[in-house]
């Protein structure tokens, strides 16, 4: 296992799901962590599990990534230059495109696209990362092609992919885009319905999905190997192959499948 003692990793959305699992995976390698999320109590639980895994120094930051004033104030407080910036915070959606309110479309774009972009720019302006920093951003299999009842989510995750690929080319730096499929996390609980209310239940796809820790192991392994993309999940990942090589089949049957 790679030794990351002396390295600093900032992870957003670190209080649960893939973010918490990524934090533990970096902790096992001895990295120092800056864990950012809205829920202080959950962050403290993740901190304790990371400490037990062998993490170096751990800093907790209770903040909403869409509160740009708070993000701008936070950025200069980061000590030194980050070795890894992991942009993982996100929200999903569960509604038909034509029934989804514009406020929901904007909220999903705000959380899944504009927030990570703003944090990235704020940290750069504060001198907290440079071209030697490795950035990882959590997109989704839905960021590779469309899925039903995920129109805003797909749009945001596609935008995230485009932005960070462009940044990689401009800065000549390492960027890894993470494309998880169905992972057993609580993301569907907070997913937005057409009217903006919370979905409030676990989808079968999530409930039966890959364990978050197993997902994180593959993601961190890919990050440390310098991969540009890490695609991780179960049998649903065959959709990537079908979309690329048999698009006619994909568009005929994908609408009938349960979305990710």
Question: What do these predicted regions represent?
Answer:
Residues 31-45:
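Conserved glycine-rich Rossmann-like NAD(P)H-binding loop of the short-chain dehydrogenase/reductase
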Residues 96-107:
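Substrate-binding pocket helix/loop in short-chain dehydrogenase/reductase
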Residues 53-68:
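Rossmann-fold cofactor-recognition segment
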Residues 172-234:
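SDR active-site lid
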Residues 15-16:
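Conserved glycine-rich cofactor-binding loop
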Residues 140:
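Residue(s) in the substrate-gating loop at a strand-loop-helix junction
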Residues 120, 156:
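Active-site helix of classical SDR
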